[in-house]
Amino acid sequence: MKKNVIVGQSGGPTAVFNASLAGVYKTAKDMGADTIYGMRYGIQGLLEKKIVDLGEKIRNDMDVELLKRTPASFLGSCRYKLPEISEDKAIYEKIFAILEELEIMAFFYIGDNDSMDTIKKLSDYAETVGNPIRFIGVPKTIDNDLEGTDHTPGYGSAAKYIATVTKELVRDGLIYEMQSVTVIEIMGRNAGWLTGAAVLAKSEDCEGPDLIYLPEVAFDVDDFLKKVKKLVSEKQSIVIAVSEGIKTADGRYVCELSAPSDKTDSFGHVQLSGTGKYLSDLIIEKLGCKSRAIELSTLQRCAGHLTSRVDITEAYQVGGTAVKAAFEGKTGQMVILKRVSQDPYICTTDLYDVHKVANLEKKVPRSWITEEGDYVTAEMKNYIEPLIQAELTPIMITGQPRHIIIDDL
């Protein structure tokens, strides 16, 4: 049997998404894989037989290094949800027919919660029909909401970007004597890991954000305005960090208080946008002071110019661990990161049953949020800080970062 493997990327991109792909590719090559295929646009592309030989696209060690430092998704991504096996067996038969045609022995999928659901379903189907293909999930998400792992690759670099931008916005807000309130809207539907990273801006040379609101705690609009009013009476410039997904006590998204959104993605998730603007407009209307909303949006997930070396290193490692696990005969597993020491920071890789991960969501512990729900504690800051350490700058050509791309992508 040939030792051919295939890898795909799925879900929202990160600044280190491709570092995990590089880890899969290089380790598979070093372990003697015959052909390393890449799925274009994830499982959706596989169904359409959009497949490339990565050996023809990643030609040498310099290409591997470029891949590690290229943000977003080299192979392209998708948000495609596989049906339950009982609902559409034909789609699984089609996937496995394609994999068998390519003589695949191992299948790697780099992604988030929904991607781990794909690994779960494919490994379950393989077991049902007695197919020996091994399925391993490689964690990735800036949201940091995957169960079973200390943190996810992609989060550290996003946290570094958010902390840096917050610090710079605090500095920018102090340039005029005029009173101002800046509301920074940060990604995070149900989990506030990203927004919590704004606390890292609080340092010797920066007072950091004045208020931080996470979706784990119900948001009270009146209480918010009361606190902002008090801050306005005390300070020249106020900076507030809010998760896009904060909700009121009755379960309504704050961004929908002005106009409910009817837009959803392929997984049925409401598309959130406008939380910062709604609150900023409310401050102007109710308090009569200058305010602006800053929506970090996709910038926080594609900032390859400000990555964490720790994050890139770990992203590469989980890719390599996935390959080693498959070559050892493991299947139905997700690679995880285990923090074995806080100071000095030491993290190792391990495996975790994908059935305990798929479709679950890890939230910020309530004890890491202040009692009033308007800031995060030292425990959260200590948890995040090691993940943003050191830098791995892009390879620069004529003053611009050089990226590796697939010509026909």
Across the structure, where does each feature detected by a protein language model lie?
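C-terminal non-catalytic interaction/assembly regions of soluble proteins
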Residues: 256-409
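Gly-rich Lys/Arg/Thr-decorated short loops/hinges at beta-loop-alpha junctions or inter-strand turns
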Residues: 4-7, 67-81, 140-150, 178-180, ...
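Accessory alpha-helical/coil subdomains and C-terminal extensions
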Residues: 36, 98, 106-111, 117-132, ...
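Glycine-rich oxoanion-binding loops at beta->alpha junctions
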Residues: 49-105, 114, 153-155, 167
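Short glycine/serine/threonine-rich phosphate/pyrophosphate-binding segments
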Residues: 14-24, 46-47, 90-93, 113-121, ...
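N-terminal phosphate-binding or glycine-rich loops at protein starts, especially the Walker A/P-loop
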Residues: 1-52
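Short, ordered loop/turn segments at secondary-structure junctions
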Residues: 10-12, 39-45, 79-80, 112-113, ...
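Short glycine-rich or small-residue beta-strand-to-loop segments that form or flank ligand, phosphate
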Residues: 4-14, 73-79, 105-111, 137, ...
